[in-house]
Amino acid sequence: MISEKAATALATIATVCWCVQLIPQIIYNWKKKDCTGLPPLMMFLWVVSGIPFAIYFCVSKGNVILQVQPHLFMFFCSISFVQSCYYPPISMARSKIVMIVAAIIAADVGMEVGFILWLRPLYEKGVKWPDLIFGISASVLLAVGLLPPYFELAKRKGRVIGINFAFLFIDSLGAWLSIISVILGNMDIMGIILYSIVAGMELGIFASHFIWWCRFRFLAKGNTFDEESGQAQKEEPDEKIEQDISKSDRNVTNYNLDNCSIPDDASSFADDFNIYDSTDGGTLSRAQTLHAVHGVVVRTDPDRYSRLSV
């Protein structure tokens, strides 16, 4: 052990980070009212990982902070999980969300009470391997929960959508501080490996977005980007578009033709549809129908065809 005081201080800071890291994400979701890019599976796995974490620290009789931390972590993860299910693109029914949360709470209470009462006497007798299994399984669930965001990154060429970077930074900071505290403390190799997996996967998310930014945002000047797909689109000023439309309007000519002069286009490019008259804002009557022929909108009156400016 290099420095017990330094290890304890760093572990405490890391624990605090892992208590509050999801608050920025929750606020971010609430403001956007949209969780596109934040996989519900990620939050669900993190909620479930809190159960074995709580059992592990309660059985080993860790300090109060370590026993409270998994429960706070589960609480904030549950809020974010509910948001990811309720907001688009999932938009799950409230009744279904309530049933899922109730099942998680029931499983949490049952497992914690049962395993803590069963394993604590064994731990006091020196049988520690059952408790260690819970600690390892919790860390594995936490790391596996970081896999779904990579599928979201693949959909958008590496761009991070829906994940708040403040949340990601605080969570990564907790992992790195935990690694340093273990190195300065008892040099638990298993702990270093598990914390390193979490830190490495979160670093990969940062790196993915940075690479996307270098490829598309920084190098492709004069382009705009779709928020969902991340596809680059040419940027055109609104004034130029308006000028082009006005020029096009000046070239439009109205024609009064007989019904028999223009044969009906029965191809797949022609279609009848309802629309409001652009001149007076009123709805077209039954005698006035619209017909689209290869992208040209014409208005049919009983005695004439005329092209509309749209």
From Swiss-Prot:
Provide the PQ-loop domain boundaries.
5-69, 138-194
- Cross-referenced SMART domains: CTNS (SM00679)
Any idea which UniProt keywords this protein has?
Cell membrane, Glycoprotein, Membrane, Phosphoprotein, Repeat, Transmembrane, Transmembrane helix
Topologically, how does it sit relative to the membrane? Multi-pass membrane protein
Where's it mainly located? membrane
Give TM segment ranges.
7-27, 37-57, 62-82, 97-117, 132-152, 165-185, 192-212
Q: Which GO terms describe its cellular component?
A: membrane; plasma membrane
Q: Which residues lie on this side of the membrane: Cytoplasmic?
A: 1-6, 58-61, 118-131, 186-191
Glycosylation: residue positions = 251, 259
Instruction: Classify the source by domain of life.
Output: Eukaryota
UniProt xrefs under InterPro entries: LAAT-1 (IPR051415), PQ-loop_rpt (IPR006603)
Kindly report every residue range on the membrane side named Extracellular: 28-36, 83-96, 153-164, 213-310
Give the location in the cell: Cell membrane
Which residues are reported to carry the modification Phosphoserine? 229
Give the protein's recorded name.
Uncharacterized membrane protein YDR090C
Query: What taxonomic lineage is listed for the species of origin?
Result: Eukaryota, Fungi, Dikarya, Ascomycota, Saccharomycotina
